């Protein structure tokens, strides 16, 4: 019997393993940490922001083993009742979170070519956890599944239909776990019923996306088949004319691999500013008179406002605009610049509410007479993953807290 059940949440990236341990009763985080530099000589683990310690083994199983040792040191190893995994891409196969079985692992492996950098890493985490935590139910939570409610007209590209039929080329969308969590919080904050509601959510971080949520379901989103489409991001270009890329290739002789690196790693805020992908650095530079930092920020907010307005067209009514993610939660400048560009909706920002720090938590930042309220809601993907694990996993009766 587990007296104090906890949920271990694992997010295996292309070179890191982020993890959290949450109290299963309250879903409050007890431990957070990261094993970084996986599969390199400099691999390390850091817990609760503490000093990094080198990993004895540098692969994913070594990272999970180090996490297990940290749990043992805190007498939590025997308390792990469930494990929730963030899986980057569920393709068209997974429309919701699911308990992990051998069949599910095989299905994830089959669709992993859609996200090779992340899905194979995710599976490495699943296999390592299976070995280190035998008998503990694991649950897969897909970054794409929330968007499986998109209609064909929202997910199809204007390409020959055979590419969709034969290759699965379509919009899948990402940040689904974040958009789903924030939408659920927004119904309470804005005092609106989920079953008759229209929200546009802006998840703004180094990666950024917009999602239109109608009656609790995603009906449109800005990211596409990959997380490259849509908004200008930290190092990703977002929407770009393919003809422009073809012209660059012709003029420079760059290969497809070269251009893929450019649009993913050298573009966005970094590419326009020539300075940094970090918005905090760019905001300071703008105030110091750096012209291209200003240009990068204004391009960033123009694209955000345009996508918010466009996504509102997928709703029957706009009940609220919600900002989340590291930038959405913490940058009063970005929220101000974006809402200034949304006056067509009758949005009126309250400067005092907007100026509150991110630590102020969930809050409405518009005036009482604003036609459409805007809010800040901190995302909590780890909590959403833990809640899904609790809802779907097999838990000892003593842990029947859901």
Swiss-Prot record:
Recorded metabolic or biological pathway in which this protein acts: Amino-acid degradation; L-threonine degradation via propanoate pathway; propanoate from L-threonine: step 4/4
A Gene Ontology cellular-component term: cytosol
InterPro entries: Ac/propionate_kinase, Aliphatic_acid_kin_short-chain, Aliphatic_acid_kinase_CS, ATPase_NBD, Propionate_kinase
Record has ATP-binding as a keyword: yes
Residues involved in Mg(2+) binding: 11
Catalytic activity entry: propanoate + ATP = propanoyl phosphate + ADP
Active site (catalytic residues): 143
Keyword line: ATP-binding, Kinase, Magnesium, Metal-binding, Nucleotide-binding, Transferase
GO function term, MF aspect, one: propionate kinase activity
Sequence positions that bind ATP: 11, 18, 175, 203-207, 278-280, 326-330
Catalytic class of the enzyme: transferase
Family classification: Belongs to the acetokinase family. TdcD subfamily.
Free-text function comment from the UniProt entry: Catalyzes the conversion of propionyl phosphate and ADP to propionate and ATP.
Protein name: Propionate kinase
Organism from which the protein derives: Enterobacter sp. (strain 638)
Gene (UniProt): tdcD
């Amino acid at each position: 019997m587990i007296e104090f059940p906890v949920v271990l949440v694992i997010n295996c990236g292309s070179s890191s393993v982020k993890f959290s341990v949450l109290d299963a009763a309250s879903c409050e985080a007890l431990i957070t940490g990261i094993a970084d530099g996986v599969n390199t000589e400099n691999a390390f683990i850091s817990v609760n922001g503490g000093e990094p310690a080198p990993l004895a083994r540098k692969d994913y199983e070594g990272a999970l083993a180090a996490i297990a040792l940290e749990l043992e040191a805190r007498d939590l190893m025997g308390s792990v009742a469930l494990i929730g995994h963030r899986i980057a891409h569920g393709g068209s196969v997974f429309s919701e979170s699911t308990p992990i079985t051998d069949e599910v692992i095989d299905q994830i492996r089959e669709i992993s070519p859609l996200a090779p950098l992340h899905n194979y890493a995710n599976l490495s985490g699943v296999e390592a956890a299976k070995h280190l935590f035998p008998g503990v139910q694991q649950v897969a939570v897909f970054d794409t599944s929330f968007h499986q409610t998109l209609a064909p007209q929202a997910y199809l590209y204007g390409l020959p239909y055979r590419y969709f039929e034969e290759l699965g080329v379509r919009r899948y969308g990402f940040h689904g776990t974040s958009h789903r969590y924030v939408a659920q919080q927004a119904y309470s904050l804005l005092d609106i019923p989920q079953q008759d509601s229209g929200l546009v959510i802006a998840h703004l971080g180094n990666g950024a996306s917009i999602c239109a949520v109608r009656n609790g379901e995603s009906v449109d989103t800005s990211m596409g088949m990959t997380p490259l489409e849509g908004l200008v991001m930290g190092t990703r270009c977002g929407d770009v004319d393919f003809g422009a890329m073809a012209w660059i290739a012709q003029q420079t002789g760059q290969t497809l691999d070269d251009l893929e690196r450019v649009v993913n790693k050298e573009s966005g805020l970094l590419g326009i500013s020539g300075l940094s992908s970090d918005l905090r650095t760019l905001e300071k530079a703008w105030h110091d008179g750096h012209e291209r930092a200003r240009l990068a920020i204004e391009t960033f907010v123009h694209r955000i406002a345009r996508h918010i307005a466009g996504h509102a067209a997928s709703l029957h009514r706009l009940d609220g605009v919600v900002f989340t993610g590291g930038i959405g939660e913490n940058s009063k400048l970005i929220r101000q610049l974006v809402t200034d560009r949304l006056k067509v909706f009758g949005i009126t920002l309250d400067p005092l509410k907007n100026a509150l720090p991110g630590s102020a938590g969930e809050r409405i930042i518009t005036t009482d007479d604003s036609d459409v309220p805007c809010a800040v809601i901190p995302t909590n993907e780890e909590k959403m993953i833990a809640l899904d694990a609790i809802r779907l996993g097999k838990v000892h009766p003593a842990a029947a807290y859901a």
